[in-house]
């Protein structure tokens, strides 16, 4: 068709890994319980929308606790919290086959990233917020670390649900 030359174009861009957990900052539970608070509704509805907009993904929904209490109770509490979020999603039309609840208890403490270090300069970058570190801090800083460890996250497990 009259073409004499060919060109090769190279693009360099970064793509965030889909398996990296996404922290949901606006999911809240009653103290020591797995009951979702009314303040969680907006965040939960955003997750429903995300899942409806992406019907081929499956996710792991994980809940984490702080160091307060014993390990077994924290593991049970976190699993019940993850299940509460999953139940909400199912009640809002998301297929249960796309959702895997996991309770990690205090097994996976937060690792301080650059953003957390900037927000809390006393937390060194790459520091694991585990018991050994937290107990070296003042009481008010311990509570900050405990609150950071109490979290709900999701990560994408598959992007091929119902495609084949």
Regions found by a protein language model. Name each.
Residues 1-58, 97, 119-122, 141-148, ...:
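Periplasmic peptidoglycan-binding/tethering modules of Gram-negative envelope proteins
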Residues 61:
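Conserved phosphate/oxyanion-binding catalytic-loop motifs
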Residues 64-164:
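Periplasmic OmpA-like peptidoglycan-binding domain that tethers envelope proteins to the cell wall
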């Amino acid at each position: 068709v009259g073409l004499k030359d060919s060109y090769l174009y190279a693009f360099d861009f970064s793509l965030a890994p889909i398996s990296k957990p996404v922290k949901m900052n606006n999911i809240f539970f009653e103290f020591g319980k797995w009951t979702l608070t009314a303040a969680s509704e907006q965040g939960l509805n955003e997750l429903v929308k995300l899942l409806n907009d992406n019907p081929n993904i499956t996710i792991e929904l994980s809940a984490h606790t702080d160091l307060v209490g014993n390990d077994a109770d924290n593991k049970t509490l976190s699993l019940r919290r993850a299940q509460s979020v999953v139940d909400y999603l199912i009640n809002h039309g998301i297929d249960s086959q796309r959702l895997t609840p996991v309770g990690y208890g205090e097994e996976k403490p937060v690792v301080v990233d650059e953003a957390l270090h900037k927000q809390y300069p006393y937390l060194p970058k790459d520091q694991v917020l585990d018991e050994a570190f937290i107990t070296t801090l003042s009481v008010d800083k311990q509570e900050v670390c405990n609150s950071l460890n109490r979290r709900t996250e999701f990560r994408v497990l598959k992007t091929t649900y119902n495609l084949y």
